[in-house]
């Protein structure tokens, strides 16, 4: 009796991810892998091949979509499809979206709604999907179905009879206002209810404000949202209700809509975990990403150095990485650094101080490096190897007969004013950080050969919304709880441009230097 109860409990606790992984194993054992084979139309019309974990995630999705009935989840096929892809930052979630757009187009869907909580994410994603001339465009130059060219268009309002792929890109604020504030040439809720939609929700952890608060409130329709509306206010006003009830389920009417969410950070709140037990289709966290060898290791360097010395210490690492990249023949390599201040005013002051320091830097300014090693704690922890990393850089200087004057000259050449940006716009008069469009463009193609940026000054731009994947160092320019600062030797990225690089040299660069 006890055994029966235990098996029943395990079945009740089973997640969709558990089920689909078990099902995949069974199909593989039965040599029925054709069941989850990727459609030729999808693979042929993407610019890049899939990484192993992307292919696995799509296979999981296909197993779910092609299975008509799930015994462990008897109601799941009686409601609109709602799935979540839980994948680490840098693992290629946008590539997954592109593949799923093609998949659903082949199934007959024509209207796609991409939404997120920040305008700058909307802007950078548009280019990935709709501009064939953009460096990060994810489809082939022409999407072909047989001999027919399939157009892909950015739209503000959907046409009822589209001959191609239509994507509406929007933020939470704009979607809310479109639905509840009727204006000419704007999408209304009635318009959306007349269509079959595939909704792509990026940074999906913002969908769970009401679940975390155990409250499913109705939208307050009296107040229009704008750029000044706080994130908390946006989420409080029913982001979750709007997407799930009004759009996905068409306010209780029959619906064939699809909601696909993407996030690297699903809240650990018990209610949220329960909500997604039958929705998570893949899990690929930072730990797994590191183990695959396609992202940078993360190391924490703590010290009691003053602000200027902390900056110069980071510049040592940047120079060292540059030298290692030259050694291994990695072209157009830029070890971009981010300097984080506590307030906007402090960030402006730190930015100006940095420009002054690098303009006037001398070899003698780096002399502290030979005496301060004792102030760093050595550690066996791979994430806390500041002393070891510094020793490696200094040994490299000695072994290769470099001097600090070479380091100073390199800094002067590579960190001029046009190589450094501050994320807060010079025209911004508000108390919150606001970036102008030109700076956003630079932030979102840091890896481009013609992008000159090597250093970024910011207050709170470590959250989602721009391409943090290209960072190699995050340097805190204010005191922490222990009274000192820290340099996090960081970086998280899966870059298509390095697919053909020799894997050992790519790994060596970061395992040695970060």
UniProtKB/Swiss-Prot annotation:
Q: Which InterPro entries match?
A: Helicase/UvrB_N, Helicase_ATP-bd, P-loop_NTPase
Listed GO biological process terms? DNA restriction-modification system
> Which EC number applies?
3.1.21.5
Q: Sorted alphabetically, which Gene3D superfamilies does this protein's record hold? A: P-loop containing nucleotide triphosphate hydrolases
Top-level class of the enzyme under EC nomenclature: hydrolase
Q: Which UniProt keywords apply?
A: ATP-binding, DNA-binding, Endonuclease, Helicase, Hydrolase, Nuclease, Nucleotide-binding, Restriction system, S-adenosyl-L-methionine
User: Known SUPFAM superfamilies for this protein?
Assistant: P-loop containing nucleoside triphosphate hydrolases
Q: Work out whether the entry's keyword set contains Cell inner membrane.
A: no
Sum up the protein's function in the record's words. A type III restriction enzyme that recognizes 2 inversely oriented double-stranded sequences 5'-CGAAT-3' and cleaves 25-27 base pairs downstream. After binding to one recognition site undergoes random one-dimensional diffusion along DNA until it collides with a stationary enzyme bound to the second DNA site, which is when DNA cleavage occurs. DNA restriction requires both the Res and Mod subunits.
- Comment block on domains: Has a helicase-type domain in its N-terminus and an endonuclease-type domain in its C-terminus.
State the protein's name: Probable type III restriction-modification enzyme HindVIP Res subunit
What is the organism of origin for this protein?
Answer: Haemophilus influenzae (strain ATCC 51907 / DSM 11121 / KW20 / Rd)
Question: Coding gene?
Answer: res
